[in-house]
């Protein structure tokens, strides 16, 4: 707690039998895929882009296999994984920050030990879901899109989104929502998140 953790640190903990975790399938869920890509970036030394040649790096397949050998439960959905974690007595979970917050809220309400969030400094992957519009010349649909966009970007709605444990930008959280992003759970509300 309180120290920077690398993906290599996680790998060492798995190899020594100190760490097992739940993670969604990289082929079925964005959170699992994002974690897998983050792990690859870290194991490759954080190249600008992962190339086919990078994936042929000697030892990479063995390292990623060892890393994923720490998965003791998988799921096809991030929410399902959270639910499994809450009912299964597992030790750790790789998931979205907002779902760790949600799990901790439930664990705390039940009087159980909460999770401590770890952000691997060299293997962090972000889920950024932009809203887009394809212009097909329909001004009525375009206006509906612009109205929705304005609504979603309003201060009130951005605050409501943040109250669910979801960051609405890369530069921390608002003062009024700090109680959701609890530092005693390892959450770093002031951390500028970047992959």
How would you label these PLM feature ranges?
Residues 1-42:
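A conserved helix-loop-strand patch within extracytoplasmic ligand-binding domains
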Residues 1-5, 41-50, 137-145:
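Short helix-loop capping/hinge motifs at secondary-structure junctions, enriched
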Residues 15, 39-48, 86, 105, ...:
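Sec-exported extracytoplasmic/periplasmic mature domains
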Residues 20-26, 68-71, 134-138:
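Second-shell loop/turn segments in exported
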Residues 20-23, 91-96, 132:
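Structural recognition of the beta-strand scaffold that forms the well-ordered cores
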Residues 26-31, 98-101, 122-125, 137-138:
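Solvent-exposed loop/turn segments at secondary-structure junctions
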Residues 41, 46-119:
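Ligand-binding pocket segment of bilobal, Venus flytrap-like solute-binding proteins
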Residues 134-195:
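Extracellular/periplasmic juxtamembrane helices and adjacent flexible linkers that interface
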